[in-house]
Amino acid sequence: MRFLLFFLVFNISNFISAQISNNDENIYDSLFVKWNDTFLTPKNTALNLVCPKIDTVRIAVIGLGNRGMMAIERLPQIPTIKIVAIADIDSNKVNKALRSLHDTQFDLPKPYYEKNDWKLICQRNDIDLIYVCTHWELHTPIAIYAMEHDKHVAVEVPAALTVDECWQLVKTAEKTRKHCIQLENCMYDFFELTALNMVQNNLLGEVVHVEGAYIHDLRSLNFSNTYYWNNWRLKRLQQTNGNTYPTHGLGPLAHLLNIHRGDKMSHLVSMSSDQFGLTKYANDQLKDSDNWKGNKFEKGDMNTTLIKTANGKTIMLQHDVTSPRPYSRLFTVSGTDGFIQKYPKPTIALEPKAHFSFSSKQIDSIMTVYEPKTIKEIKEKALKVGGHGGMDFIMDYRLIYCLNNGLPLDQDVYDAAEWSSIIELSKKSVRSGSKTVKIPDFTRNNWNVLNKVSYYLK
């Protein structure tokens, strides 16, 4: 590996040409592995959970807001699914979804319009997967009810809002032996997937520190009276502090660090700035008659959370949806032999010349070599179908592929619980003056049963 690093730095053009000419096999694809029964885990856990194959996955989409409508447009591009039910309390959105599906699916799904119709959907016996895209407060209740009625669940982020809800998800998934995952699309960003494969090939040596974020100026959308139903997202900023949306930044880093697959998050400290931006925006942009003008918001503009793992690694997470600045998830990875960062621009630096980043052309070449073969095979379609640059389609594709073939899913219920728990735990630390807060081990001492993150193939 040291020779490879040296060769990459000083003779990268020849290195890339040699690897690209080897079309038979991507010898650097460590992330996607063929499943076999030696990967089975104890029956009392949901680690590497295996369920019967489903040839055609019958899906109910609950919640047809922004994410739900995008799913309605993407999912029919996968031939082994059928949407059999859709639900939203806004009849206009239901009818819009039906019109969209009329062009992509022969049999239209049964529409549901009432507030509690999600329970009727979960009670049906002709549904395999409940795809939850509602506002956050309904994520856990629907997921629990669905699993209790023999359904797999894919729930938008965050999967839960409290540690207690996280435990409910874990215990229900273990008891019912049903998949329960978050629809964390950032796991499938081309750069982040390739970086994960690079780390698994030891290109950076031992990873020591990582940084992630959700930095996204949402002021105009949050104060819109139409974009988020009933201003549910703005109300969260009014009512709570800490990191209220951690999973986009944390998810890819957690897999990169093999969290609950050889390491675990141990404890955190969290600190928030005071709140300035929302008040200023409301005063500057809203009409005097707007009900939100003059409101107080608990959420500080910038939250920074530091996490320590059992193996001595550190994670920095940031959350800011109120500042006028470019979008960023940071995605910074620092190891003993090199460095990767996506934002503000892709950067790769490796020993022995790590003081300098490779050029953009060289970075593209490195990414070409280490992009997993499985992703290369579906990349063209993913880019065509779209969804945040294609990562949403890859997320759906991998979910359905694993259900079709009876494989463990790329994410599991412990991921959902660990990443979502940061919401309440960071809030607790902020309120205590940034005292240390312990992070629960949702696997209950099974965090080192597996030794790495793997995405499985048949």
What kind of region is each of these model predictions?
Residues T305-N311, G335:
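Active-site beta-strand termini and strand-to-loop segments that position acidic
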